[in-house]
Swiss-Prot record:
It comes from Elephantid herpesvirus 1 (isolate Asian elephant/Berlin/Kiba/1998) (EIHV-1). It catalyses: L-tyrosyl-[protein] + ATP = O-phospho-L-tyrosyl-[protein] + ADP + H(+). SUPFAM superfamilies: Protein kinase-like (PK-like). It comes from the Viruses. Signal peptide: none annotated. The active site is at 274 (proton acceptor). This is Phosphotransferase UL97 homolog. Keywords: Kinase, Transferase. One of its GO terms (molecular function) is ATP binding. Belongs to the protein kinase superfamily. Tyr protein kinase family. The keyword Transferase applies. It is an enzyme of class 2 (transferase). Disulfide bonds: none annotated.
Amino acid sequence: MLSKIMASKSQSVCSFKKYKNFFMNNVRLLRESILLNTNHDVVTEQKCHKSDQNPKRSRAKIQKRYNSEKKHACCVSNLHLTCVEVSLSSSSPSQSDPRTVDNDSSVARKKRVTAYLQQVECDEDFFKDLRLPTKHSETDKWTLVYVPRVFSDCDSYCARPRKRLLGAGSYGEAYLTDRGVTKKVFSNSEILAEAYMLANIIQVEGWEIHAAHLRIANSICFRHNTVSYTFYKTDLYHFNAHSVDALENYRYTFRQLCDAICFLNLRCKLVHADVSASNILINTDEEYILHAVLGDYSLCSRHDRERAIIIMNENNGKSLGVCQSDLQVEGTYQIVYRPLHLMFWCVTMRTLSIWQLCREAREFCVMDLCALGRVATLFTLHLISHETSVSVRRGLFSVHKKYEKEKTANGHKVEYGIHVILNSLWIVTCLCPTFYKQSGISMMTKLIEAFPQHEKCLNTYTKWLGEELPFRGVGIILENKYGQELLDFISKTSGVDDFRKPLGPIFETLTV
């Protein structure tokens, strides 16, 4: 009996040492990579701390152009849906425990879609004088959308020579043509989603203004399975001309993206589910962002997933149908930009559906805004130090790749998932001085309660977080009122531990 107890104790000690070494080695490596790169190099000094003695010759020209763009953007009645609140009444269905909600299988719903298609007839008269995809009708079972032939301008888009391949992925290929970007889609589901989303947006009054920061299609062709968009120079991920001098511009850009997400969720009842730096396309003039749009709707889903989407296409006379797929928490957002609360559920219950966490438009909206906060976190690191940001991003992606490659049944996947959360908590703590005392402690408490076997290691990490100093260079951002608002946005979105809770105002009122 004594030998069994000693063996069990020895096994427990070995297990503790294993987890302790795992956490401490990774944390030490990440901390060293950051601390060794907190001093500004010459390139960073030029980017982030402009010298008044050597101003750029085009400075006045750039400032004039930026002010002109800003004045033009602000003269319209822009949306300011930046206060996301949720009713917490006991009668709300969102109050139920997400782990106890029945998850309707996508197979059963696909069978229902097939049955619905047999019942729906095409109203050919509705195509007359139709110029854009338009909702025809909506029932408890389906939403009917008509797509006209005129809208799919093959002569201008599909038949144009493809000048250059911009990129290729699992969803299709993107080419640059004379009229913009044409994307060849491999699957029907994405082109159906694009048609439905456009029909949903244009039914909102004043959609041209509200959707100014959403990348919507210029043309959809069901015959060639292509979608055409306006061309943008780059995306936020590859943007590397960050400057503290442009903080007002960056804060204004993220404010516009917040309005776009609120419009998409609160007015169009659509969740993006893939907000990331690579999906935010921008036009720039040196360090200034002139225009930014949120694109890539391959994971975009309607809040009410029970209705089938049926497309009547004038091009080939066929009726196409699609139903919402079951988006699990692990299949939404890129892991680097996944909200911390969502990452916690990935570690504890990876098969959970997002519809079990969010039931109302405001809850889906908070989830998308939290992902945008993660984008702002890595973006702001570039303002502090280019080398620091590169080190942090390299460390994050290496850990995240290990997490994604691990098999579901492997215990290391949970360990890497915890490490992802800890890294994110540490970065936000070093970026926002008051974050840990306000919100970070509650996340650490949840981790300790969920994984009591790691309690000693997590307590050690908790102590480190409590004593951690801000990144060198944060003070420069804090001294700027626009930088302070940007850090507040990061802190608020990172501290969300339940999408049902009110997020509150995420930016102060925009003043021109």
